[in-house]
Amino acid sequence: LGAPVTLDQVRIGPIVVGEDNKDHVLFPRKIGGRFIAFHRRWPNVWLAQSEDLRTWPEEWMAPIYGPRQDNYWDATSVGSNGVPIETEHGWLCLNHGYTTVVEGATSLTGSAVVTRMYRLGVILLDLDDPTKVVHRPKEPIFWPEELWELRGDVPNVVFNNGTVVVGDEVYVYYGGADHVVGLATCKLADLVDYARFG
């Protein structure tokens, strides 16, 4: 066996204190001389900026996008997932959203069962100014279909835990129904095309 590995770490603390704020994602490089991060101030995804990773001034924060109305797949809530991927067309960002799903009446209660359905989507942001949305497709790229995505600790969930690009292939590691880990893959060019034109 080899020697143990020690990971260096820096704890940067919360971006916002005292409110429902999660789904933090740090961009892989500085933009305009600042560190950039997504965070979710319910119900919208916000962009925050920092010069030192420790202070995130409120005046450098802005909402980028939020839930869509009507019958969209992300009509209730949205959040960011995985480090944005830099492409020639902009920042390719995976996101999640959910909406309420009403299922048929149960035999025990006679009333409908209301659950959430979490899906994965993609959004393209401007490369130099990620506060600008270049395109946001109307449909998700991935949704629960397998039994282990539909039934588990939290049913009807696919939730991206990390995205890796190897060559021209994108590997999306995701949680299924909050109890298993799955892997979905696609070609980077296909995902970029869908983000641009979908």
Where are these regions (language model features)?
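Beta-rich carbohydrate-recognition and catalytic domains
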Residues: 1-76, 85-153, 167-170, 174-198
